[in-house]
Regions:
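Conserved ATP-binding TGD loop and adjacent catalytic N/P-domain core of P-type ATPases
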Residues: 9, 26, 507, 535, ...
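Conserved cytosolic catalytic loops of P-type ATPases
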Residues: 37-58, 62, 224-317, 417-461, ...
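Flexible metal-binding regulatory segments at protein termini and peripheral loops
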Residues: 1-131, 156, 224, 239-242, ...
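P-type ATPase nucleotide-binding
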Residues: 443-571, 581, 593-611
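Membrane-embedded alpha-helical bundles of multi-pass transporters
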Residues: 123-134, 159, 178, 182, ...
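Actuator/coupling domain of P-type ATPases
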Residues: 63-78, 82-88, 115, 126, ...
Length: 739
């Protein structure tokens, strides 16, 4: 027997058409779950997408599409790379929205005209029997032409043993239409429900149009992001300049970018200088000065000068494409709370059908005369007023808008689960270097011991550190280069994680590192002096201390404000660093972190253990970092937040990525999460409260007090407004501003 357990899982996201309610979502997920090779499937009603994790050696894209089609739905057009054909898909959705509005207005207009005749029979010179015959034709058109969507979808569901919202609408309108048809055919003068059936269809269609329009507004963030990408680029090849489609760019191409143009790819400037509007990344509208050697990001606007850049990441590898992809994935994901809602909505429609049947039977047996119209009114009102759509849209629409608003503010959320988790955070751990500080340290003092000069101290230290990528090492090498010091070769290089480096330089064994590393190696550090606020890098030659380099890293100007906002949000704020306690306390005092919340002299391999310690005390921990050595702690934390300017591995280990390096985005992300979850709770309270309150009203519980039964037409209006209210409430998140 062949085991597939070791095969890596693949993931595919497909746009699905034809879904109308939570029951549709549940049916597609069931069909996908039954397909051999599918590990997990999540279908999102708001984004109209199915995200599938599967074993590629057991099922491929065509098999997944076949499962969706077997459920009775279609997959939208795709390119060869699997990406949706955005323009064609959006045009198709625009056409569908226009058709919905047209049919809604026509059906409602016809229904209201028939209702006017029914309510004012004296206004027509014919007996009611003839009026019923005249109304049969327009009622039939509305029922089977404008209402074809509901009938076809309901029939499709019944073939698979599923009851959906379309089933409710179809049952309700067909019952009203069928009863009215019977009254007309037998020539009775009793009132009919042709008008109610037509108005119901018109109002439900109008609700669908409003819902589709609101969902389109919520999904506009991705379209807006992709519109930032230029369609052509000015490429320099073989000494000639030519405009090429953006899809033909290659990594390594030289590109000229003129004022007023958007940068076509990620890369670095090789010639010229300018100021770039990077508001799409940071939210800050002030242009950022760029010159040769500086990195530029595709989609940003060149505000002033002309420059030549070298493309490094093009097409789907650019930051802009990755942001759009992350937003799309987050919008398509399910928050844990949604899975509970799905379990309820899966049973909702069958329960509504039973309630409608019970109401019909009750009023038929015990209702006022004439009993059959009363029973029909109650049953149709129950079927029509029930709104599974509102429950199905309550969570995904809020996640969709919240993720999009986050992207606009430079906060990339990986999933709905991350948005839900962020509002539970009670403690935030901030890594020092690159998070609280700029991550660009510089040597501010050289303290050679007797018998060693500053030049010799710097030369030996820089030669040994040249093989290291640590920010402190780069600061030492940068100072040596700036002073024009020629560095001798280093051999036997060894990097000690969290400690320093060892190498052989000029035949001498050089150790450059922290005080702790030297103590572990038995070197005396009694003569070492370092000013407060400086990181001391000690240099040892052949076991003897020869001096110290004092290195300082500037605190980010917004760090203190970020810490203040975190405290204002009732969060514990901790600092984690491998630096000396004296340095950490000096920085903590500057930004507002108390000494008892500082974890200093922590090795990289100990960072995740410190996170565990806080979790063991009951804290829900968010870890914020940017370096490779932060990845284990980010993964261990309840919520990993990566500074986007940091290492790729840190970004991969995190649930939230900050595009820029502004630390104020951390409290903003938590505030956004709280606002999103508050909106979800409001939506769910409305959706469940609406159904729990109005379904009994539609069934007639107020009849003993009021003497009337709810009109099916009013029920249709209430149902249409219910789902629209949920989407509209979610759209309020577009106005979110961090405080």
């Amino acid at each position: 027997m062949i085991s597939h357990a070791a095969a890596p899982l693949a993931e595919l996201s497909l746009p699905v058409t034809g879904m109308t309610c939570a029951s549709c979502v549940a049916r597609i997920e069931r069909f996908l779950a039954r397909a051999d090779g599918v590990e997990e499937a999540a279908v999102n009603l708001a984004t109209e997408r199915a995200t599938v994790r599967f074993h590629p050696d057991r099922i491929d894209r065509s098999g997944i599409v076949a499962a969706i089609e077997a459920a009775g739905y279609e997959v939208a057009a795709q390119t060869s790379s699997g990406e949706p054909v955005a323009e064609e898909t959006e045009r198709a959705r625009d056409a569908e929205r226009r058709a919905l509005l047209r049919d809604a207005l026509l059906a409602t207009g016809i229904g209201l005209a028939m209702m006017a005749v029914s309510m004012w029979p004296g206004g027509v010179p014919w007996p009611m029997q003839r009026v019923n015959v005249w109304m049969l034709a327009p009622a039939t058109v509305v029922q089977f032409v404008f209402g074809r969507r509901f009938l076809a979808a309901a029939a499709r569901g019944l073939r698979h043993g599923e009851l959906t919202m379309d089933t409710l609408v179809s049952l309700g309108t067909l019952a009203a239409y069928g009863y009215s048809l019977a009254i007309t055919l037998i020539g009775s003068a009793d009132p009919t429900y042709f008008d109610s059936a037509a108005v119901i269809i018109g109002l439900v269609l109008l609700g669908r149009w409003l819902e589709a329009r609101a969902k389109s507004q919520a999904a506009g963030a991705i379209r807006a992001l992709l519109r930032l990408r230029p369609t052509t680029a000015r490429v320099l090849r073989d000494g000639r300049e030519a405009d090429l489609p953006i899809d033909q760019l290659r990594a390594g191409d030289l590109l000229r970018v003129r004022p007023g143009e958007r940068v076509p790819a990620d890369g670095s400037i090789v010639e010229g200088a300018s100021a770039l509007d990077e508001s799409m990344l940071t939210g800050e509208s002030l242009p950022v000065d760029k010159r040769a050697g500086d990195r530029v990001t595709g989609g940003t606007m060149n505000a002033s000068g002309s420059f030549v850049m070298r493309a490094e990441r093009v097409g789907s590898d650019t930051t802009l494409a990755q942001i759009a992809r992350m937003v799309e994935e987050a919008q398509g994901s399910k928050a844990p709370i949604q899975r509970v809602v799905d379990q309820v909505t899966a049973r909702f429609v069958p329960v509504v059908v039973l309630v409608a049947a019970g109401a019909f039977g009750f009023w038929l047996l015990l209702g006022p005369e004439p009993r059959l119209p009363a029973a029909l009114t109650a049953a149709v009102a129950v079927l029509i007023i029930a709104c599974p759509c509102a429950m199905g849209l309550a969570t995904p629409t809020a996640i969709m808008v919240g993720a999009a608003r986050g992207a606009e503010a430079g906060i990339l959320v990986r999933s709905g689960a991350a948005l839900e988790q962020a509002q539970r955070i009670t403690a935030v751990i901030l890594d020092k270097t690159g998070t609280i500080t700029s991550g660009q340290p510089s040597v501010v003092s050289l303290r050679p011991l007797a018998g060693t000069t500053e030049l010799e101290l710097l030369r030996l230290a820089a030669a040994a550190e040249r093989g290291s990528e640590h920010p402190l090492a780069e600061a030492i090498v940068r100072l040596a280069a700036g002073r024009g010091i020629e560095l001798p070769p280093a051999t036997n290089f060894l990097s000690v994680a969290g400690g320093g480096v060892q190498a052989t330089v000029d035949g001498r064994r050089i150790v450059v590192g922290s005080e702790r590393l030297l103590i572990e190696q038995g070197v005396s550090v009694d003569q070492i002096e370092v000013e407060d606020g400086q990181t001391g890098v000690l240099v040892v030659a052949d076991g003897v201390s020869i001096g110290t380099l004092g290195i300082a890293d500037h605190v980010k100007p917004e760090a203190a404000e970020a810490v203040r906002r975190l405290h204002a949000a009732s969060l514990e704020v901790w600092m984690l660093t491998g630096d000396r306690m004296a340095v950490a306390e000096a920085i903590g005092a500057e930004v507002g972190i108390a000494p008892d919340r500082i974890l200093a002299e922590v090795r990289p391999d100990e960072k995740s253990a410190k996170v565990k310690e806080l979790q063991a005390r009951g804290a829900v921990v968010a870890m914020v970092g940017d370096g490779i050595n932060d990845a284990p702690a980010l993964a261990q934390s309840d919520l990993g937040v990566a500074i986007g300017t940091g290492a790729d591995v840190a970004v991969e280990a995190s649930e939230i990525t900050l595009v820029g390096d502004d630390l104020r985005a951390v409290p903003a992300a938590i505030q956004l999460s709280r606002a999103t979850m508050r909106t979800i709770r409001q939506n769910l309270a409305w959706a469940f409260g609406y159904n729990l309150l109005l379904i009994p009203v539609a069934a007639g519980v107020l009849f003993p007090l009021t003497g009337w039964l709810l009109s099916p037409a009013l029920a249709a209006g209430a149902m249409a407004l219910s789902s629209v209210s949920v989407v509209t409430n979610s759209l309020r998140l577009r106005r979110f501003r961090a405080s």
